[in-house]
Amino acid sequence: MEKDSDTHASLYQESLAMHRRLEGVLEVASKVRLRTIHDLSVAYTPGVAEPCRKISENQGLVYLYTLKKNTVAVVTDGSAVLGLGNIGPYAALPVMEGKAIIFKEFAGIDAFPICLDTQDTEEVIKAVKHLAPVFGGINLEDISAPRCFEIEARLREELDLPVIHDDQHGTAIVVFAGLLNALKIVKKELGELKIVISGLGAAGVAIFRFLVRAGADPAKILTCDSKGLVYEGREEGMNHIKEEIAKLTNPEKIKGGLKEAFPWADLFIGVSVGGIVTEDMVRSMAKDSIVMAMANPVPEIMPDAAKRAGARIVATGRSDFPNQLNNCLSFPGLFKGALGTCARRITPEMEMAAAYALANVVTVGELSEDHIIPDPLEKHVVPAVAKAVANASFESCAARKNLEDSV
C-alpha cells in the first residue's frame, strides 16, 4: 500500500505541474483563418446574417450551419466530484476540462465545461435549459444523489436533445459490458446470478436498473448502502429511489451488512468505499465468482486479495490493474453515435447497444480472466460503440431523419 500511495502522490504532482504550465488543458480552436477583410466579412458580419436567416426560418438547420451537431456541454454543480465530495464548481473545473479533452481526443467531439454556482435542483435544471440551444447533447457530471436522478429525468423530459448523467449510465454500460464477457468465461447465465451491489448512489442505482432491464432477476439481488442491506420496511437512510429498489429485491428481508449478503453470491459490484470487503466475504461466494470492486482510489478489496480468496475474475476502476472498468470506454462512443444522428434523446436501446458493442470489441481470442474489457486507448472502441448506438438511434426512433424538416 505504501508503494501504491507513492505512485499516486507522483501522479498528483505531475498533474498539478501540467495544469499550472498549460493554465488548464482545454482551448477553443478556429476552423477558419481570417487573413483578409473578405474572410472577416464571410465569417462574421455581414455574411453571417444569411445562416442566421436560414435558422430563423427553420430551427432544425442549426445542426447544419453551426457547431451544435458536434458539441456537448459537460455540466456539474460540484456536489459529488470523484472521491473528493462536495468541492464546489471552481474546484470541479479541472475534472470537467479533463472530461472535455477525452471527448475530443477519443471521439472528435467538442465539449465545453460548465460549472454551475448553484446546487439548487430547480436552478440547475433552469440553467441547463437556457444553455441548450448551443449544444447537441448534455453530459451531466458529478452531481450528488438523489438530486441527480430528478435533474436528469426532468431535463430528458423537457429538452429535445440527448441528456445523460454519465456517473449513472456510463458506469452501468461499462459494468454490463465487462459482465457479458465475464459470463462467457464462467459459463453462467445473467438471470441465474445471485448479485450483491454495494453503494446506492448514482452509479449503484443505475447499475441495478441496467442489470434488471438486461434480464437479471431482482429477487436474486441484494443491495447495500452505508446503513446496511436494503429491504422493504427499512426506515433508516431511505429515499424514494431506495424504496423502489427495496420492493423488488431482498424478498427474504435479510438484515445486516455485506457480510450477510456475500454467502453464495455469484457477482459482487462495488461502487462504494475502499477496503470494506474482506477475503472471508469473497471466500463465502459461489464457485467461479466475479468481483467488480470499483471504489477509487482504493477498491473495496484489492485484486490480489480477491483472487487469493477464490474470485475467478476481478475488475476495478483503476488503470494499474487488469480489467479497468472506466466510463471513458462508454461516453465518447455513446455521444458520437447520438450526435451523428442528431438524436433527440438517448434511449435504453441505445445504451444496451453500446454495452454489447463494447463487450464485442474483445475478441474470442483475446478474452481471458484478465481481459474482459478493452483498454481505454483501444482505437476500435469508439467507432464500434458509435456505430451500434447510431443504428439503435434509428431503430428506437430517436434520430432526426430529415434536418430540413426538423424543428
Regions found by a protein language model. Give the residues of each.
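N-terminal ligand-binding/catalytic initiation module
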Residues: 1-163, 386, 392
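Adenosine-phosphate binding glycine-rich loop
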Residues: 5, 166, 186-188, 293-404
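Electropositive phosphate-/nucleotide-binding environments in soluble metabolic enzymes
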Residues: 30, 34, 45-53, 90-97, ...
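Glycine-rich phosphate/diphosphate-binding loop of Rossmann-like nucleotide-binding domains
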Residues: 82, 89-107, 159, 165, ...
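ADP-ribose/adenylate-binding Rossmann-like module
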Residues: 139-142, 267-321
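A short, aliphatic-rich alpha-helical micro-motif
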Residues: 132, 190, 261-262, 282-285
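Short, ordered loop/turn segments at secondary-structure junctions
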Residues: 77-79, 87, 116-117, 142-145, ...
